[in-house]
Amino acid sequence: LLLCVGLLLVLKHHDGAAHKLVCYFTNWAFSRPGPASILPRDLDPFLCTHLVFAFASMSNNQIVPKDPQDEKILYPEFNKLKERNRGLKTLLSIGGWNFGTVRFTTMLSTFSNRERFVSSVIALLRTHGFDGLDLFFLYPGLRGSPARDRWTFVFLLEELLQAFKNEAQLTMRPRLLLSAAVSGDPHVVQKAYEARLLGRLLDFISVLSYDLHGSWEKVTGHNSPLFSLPGDPKSSAYAMNYWRQLGVPPEKLLMGLPTYGRTFHLLKASQNELRAQAVGPASPGKYTKQAGFLAYYEICCFVRRAKKRWINDQYVPYAFKGKEWVGYDDAISFGYKAFFIKREHFGGAMVWTLDLDDFRGYFCGTGPFPLVHTLNNLLVNDEFSSTPSPKFWFSTAVNSSRIGPEMPTMTRDLTTGLGILPPGGEAVATETHRKSETMTITPKGEIATPTRTPLSFGRHTAAPEGKTESPGEKPLTTVGHLAVSPGGIAVGPVRLQTGQKVTPPGRKAGVPEKVTTPSGKMTVTPDGRAETLERRL
């Protein structure tokens, strides 16, 4: 019996059956009202393989906490979760939609600026006990970022990776992890990234395969459909296969799954199907307070009074009530996406975010974190499951893993102002968070601010095997964790090809240039030309 179990574990390791489950937690989530407020201590440390804290900021080309309270309260609570799960990895993410591109561009523009940033990253991560850095740059070469940032971003990744390796050798500690969140829109991907090089330099890549449709459009569409429809190739499957066809190892690609939905205000209540005419966003949610956006726990309240429908070709649900329409994910659609990830041998899933799931189980009646638990059961804790994967019926060729990296035909032209809302409901929430200047913890362990009454989060008690539980909660069960090797990625001399240049309308694109430089000696001049510069690490 032991021999059989050992053989199964070996097969599991080699066939890629173990997956990452990377989950974001936002530093503005505590400022939401009442039962929607959450702190790091409320997270289940056994639910995800990696937890990512969003977001850090930047000042004078150095990474810094976004708010003083992050450093004093939230960072310690976040990393203390590893005391309960020794296999858990934590990362700090920098960027986001509200962060913009100007500070990234300035930092990337010279080797000395990048060197200053890299040094500050290592110091901050080690000081607070994080295991790695996540870059959430939206987007290199777009939204005011110059075209050369497509390349200087690659230079930064190479310099971060080499510095992380050097620091690990000097300190005899595991190497810091390096990841990035990238667009799932092929238009953005072609202009913003050197995909093959990102695949070499990053430990994993989170594809933002959501916000594919929303209230910025004139007809209803799903936020994150699994599969594409004729005439509309945008889907999670297409985004993942597009990145794979660009040369990124599939085991490094994580499918982004949203724990929220996008809403529309219908033109006519009687026309409520997919691609029905719409005139902007539906009403803001009670807790997230952003038009066109609902957290999953808000959706649970909405669907009780609404009519639900299933999009057969896209494997996702939507609901409508009167003139309000929402496309969202539930446990069933998350299950289909998990099976797709396994079948296509991708590296796992990324969740945006833990704090938008029904984290206490108050709203949906299916227990805490119902959506993320579905992914955990299917991707992380699926040790010896014999459950057969469902069969998918592809509606168009773009859903196939055999697609090429050519541009799909789409009706929307890409501009530097992408014409979409900030991903994941960041816009309103971050501004709210920045107003909380004097958050304190009371002697009873409650959070108090000048605009809020203290909120009690329950008294944690010791449980068997070093875990904790709160009154009324089920004991946590340890799940498998995918170990991350501290070894680095071999990076030799890098051949850089600029590929398609971004040119103004009416001008012809120049011939793609090739620049060959030894690893670690790259910089960029103000006009975008690559030159060499000796590393000073």
From Swiss-Prot:
The keyword Cell inner membrane does not apply. It is found in: Cytoplasmic vesicle, Secretory vesicle. Residues 1-18 form the signal peptide. Oviduct. This is Oviduct-specific glycoprotein. GO terms for cellular component: extracellular region; transport vesicle. GO terms for molecular function: chitin binding; chitinase activity. Pfam families: Glyco_hydro_18 (PF00704). Glycans are attached at N399. The keyword Lyase does not apply. Belongs to the glycosyl hydrolase 18 family. Chitin binds at P68, Q69, G95, G96, W97, N98, Y139, L208, S209, Y210, D211, W352. Disulfide bonds join C23-C48. Residues 19-382 form the GH18 domain. InterPro entries: Chitinase_II/V-like_cat, Chitinase_insertion_sf, Glyco_hydro18_cat, Glycoside_hydrolase_SF, Glycosyl_Hydrlase_18. One of its GO terms (biological process) is chitin catabolic process. Residues 446-475, 498-537 are annotated as: Disordered.
